[in-house]
Regions:
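Short, solvent-exposed loop/turn segments at secondary-structure junctions
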Residues: 39-43, 68-74, 109
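Conserved TIR/SEFIR loop-to-helix hotspot centered on a Trp-containing motif
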Residues: 66-93
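Conserved N-terminal substructure of TIR/SEFIR domains
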Residues: 1-60, 94, 175-179
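C-terminal interaction surface of TIR/SEFIR-family domains
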Residues: 111-178
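Cofactor-binding loop segments of dinucleotide-utilizing enzymes, especially the Rossmann-like FAD-
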Residues: 8-9, 65, 103-107
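Nucleic-acid nuclease catalytic cores
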Residues: 96-112
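Amphipathic alpha-helical transducer elements in NTP-driven molecular machines
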Residues: 44-47, 51-54, 81-88, 133-140
Length: 179
């Protein structure tokens, strides 16, 4: 079973909880949001704890809710928390972009994310509570589709690798019988 880490700001917890509930319904996943049990250990730095989280999880889902505002080039912009963007970057670096999912809020004028992330496809949700369940369900469906496609590719690669080994064993056994 694959272990999924969900990262968000405190303000993003309602969306993270909805994602947790949706993904947790799939038996092939073990879903662990940052706020459920302490992922950050006593007497350790946050960075040390994050490195442990990277080791313990196969993929991450990060809610980049626009909780902060910053002035960028004389314009006020709404931004996700720096720590959530940092954690996303750590997961991308360790597990690859295909296993670190960005979840963004739809319809935020003047929103900003680091330019290096703008070319990476994110899934979006409707922030209104009355639409959240359906929106998050669609977000999770997109993530699960990507994982299913990745698994079938992994299965094919493993099958090809095994079939090559079986083929070699067959040739060697035929040679042994012939001698």
């Amino acid at each position: 079973r694959e272990r999924v880490f969900i990262g968000s700001s405190s303000e993003g917890i309602p969306v993270a909880e909805a994602i947790h509930k949706e993904l947790d319904a799939h038996s092939e996943l073990v879903v662990e949001p940052w706020y459920k049990k302490s992922k950050f250990k006593l007497s350790r730095s946050y960075l040390d704890s994050l490195m442990g989280i990277l080791d313990d999880h196969d993929l991450g889902v990060f809610v980049l809710s626009p909780d902060d505002s910053k002035t960028m080039r004389h314009k006020r912009m709404r931004t996700p928390r720096d720590n959530v963007v940092f954690e996303l970057g750590l997961f991308m670096g360790r597990h690859g972009c295909g296993r670190a999912f960005m979840v963004t809020q739809k319809g935020v004028p003047d929103s900003w994310i680091p330019s290096d992330l703008k070319g990476i496809h994110a899934v979006s949700y409707d922030p209104k509570p009355q639409h959240r369940a359906q929106a998050v369900s669609q977000v999770c469906e997109t993530i699960l589709e990507q994982l299913a496609g990745e698994r079938s590719y992994t299965w094919l690669t493993e099958w090809r690798s095994r079939s090559g080994v079986y083929h070699e064993q067959l040739i060697l056994s035929k040679r042994a019988v012939a001698n």
